[in-house]
Amino acid sequence: MDALRDAARGGRVNHAFAEKIMMVVTSVNGCRYCSYGHSRAALATGVPETELQKLMALDLEAFPENEVVALTFAQHYAESHCNPDPAAWQRVTSYYGEETANDIMTYLRMITFGNLLGNTFDALLSRFSGKPAQGSNLWSELSVLLGAIWLPPFRLFIRLFKSKTGNACI
């Protein structure tokens, strides 16, 4: 969460560009909740609807070079199930610099986690309606969703503990 806050406040990746990056990952992963939410957020940041449609269709060639490097990497990152080719990551780092590249990676990880939660929730809903998602099981669906529930209070506890003890090891 600290990395996300730092990325958002750092100003190296503006909000519209961050939304474009997240829309590409969401298009690959197919999360309907993230698609809806980030489409609205992208439009609110000034991304034209025509660009949004291209992002959702993964038609990335028309975007300017200063965006297409990150957008094509975002697609590769999602399609490789978070295991990108090191040469592809090196291209992002070389093009944007290490700090901006790390901010881009933070957005990629955040939206991937969001997509996982949304798709897992959909799998659980499908299971309840008698149509379990292929390749999924009740245990993994419940584990992911329950894990997401305890994460915010745990992070709050860690943050409070660090501020009282000054211990950054946790």
Show which residues each predicted segment covers.
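Hydrophobic alpha-helical segments
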Residues: 1-170
